[in-house]
Amino acid sequence: HKAIRRQRQMCIRDRVGIVEAWMIVMALCGALLFLLGIYHLRMLPSGGEATAHAGSVGEALRETGAIFRGFFRKRYIGIYIAFIVFYRFAEGLVIKIVPLFLNAPLDNQGLGLTEQQIGLYYGTFGVIAFVVGSILGGYFIAWLKLRRALFPLITIFNIPFVVYALLAWFQPASPLLICGGIVFEYFSYGFGFVGLTLFIMQQVAPGPHQMAHYAFGSSLANLGVMLPGMISGWLCDSLGGYHYFFMWALLATVPAFLLAARIPFTHPDTEEVAAEEIDKELINE
């Protein structure tokens, strides 16, 4: 009976092999995205005609240069860039290492989870927790407004790194406890990430070319994840494993807290940004 039960629980990888399993999963994802693309092509509104067109390549380049200059001339843009980058800096360190930590055997400082368990905890319970956290984070900001909610949001966003440090040091054998830590991570990520998104929308993007400037801010947030992710593997090996790596990740959260405590707000977070406030925001323009 145990053999039959195990056979039924086999994942795609066990049935067809690793390479073929990846091919099947990627093909299914590609087909799903293709169908969604056709659906959106037919159902979404066109958005109307563009209000302005570049007459030449030179004009397009000048407009692009004006967009970049406008972004870097915004008031407090230096501290805003630092805040956006460091908001997710610790996440960038941890996000590449956590799957390895969960899958590594106990004698290698890991938790010894199977791929099936990791997929279930992340792909099902984690996604649900992320959606719930995002919704509650939005209500939390609406209640307190962004200025007052920002520091609590960063705190909640970074608490999961404490959880992973504890998991690394104590290596609990309970799947329920480990799953709870992963669910809490995704809930906190959804709850806290709303604050960064709204900060970029309210304080960085307003003004001429606000869609482009919002894209710049979002790119900086992704840069704050990519850069530490590039060194996370080397850092984990250099520190001697997961124990000290997650402790180091906790130290990496400090700049975000320091910046959040003193971050200036260019625009009020209680009402729509007025046109005259946008004009005052730009320096030397």
Name each model-derived stretch:
Residues 132-151, 236-237:
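Helix-to-loop junctions at the C-terminal end of transmembrane segments
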Residues 207-238:
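A late C-terminal transmembrane helix in Major Facilitator Superfamily
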Residues 30-50, 259-264:
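C-terminal membrane-cytosol helix-exit motif in multi-pass small-molecule transporters
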Residues 73-94, 183:
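Pair of pore-lining "gating" transmembrane helices in MFS-fold secondary transporters
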Residues 96-119:
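Short amphipathic helix-loop junctions that connect adjacent transmembrane helices
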Residues 147-196:
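C-terminal transmembrane helical hairpin of 12-TM major facilitator-type secondary transporters
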Residues 48-80, 279-285:
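Juxtamembrane intracellular "pre-TM" segments in multi-pass secondary transporters
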Residues 1-8, 12:
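Single conserved hydrophobic/aromatic residue that forms the stacking wall/gate
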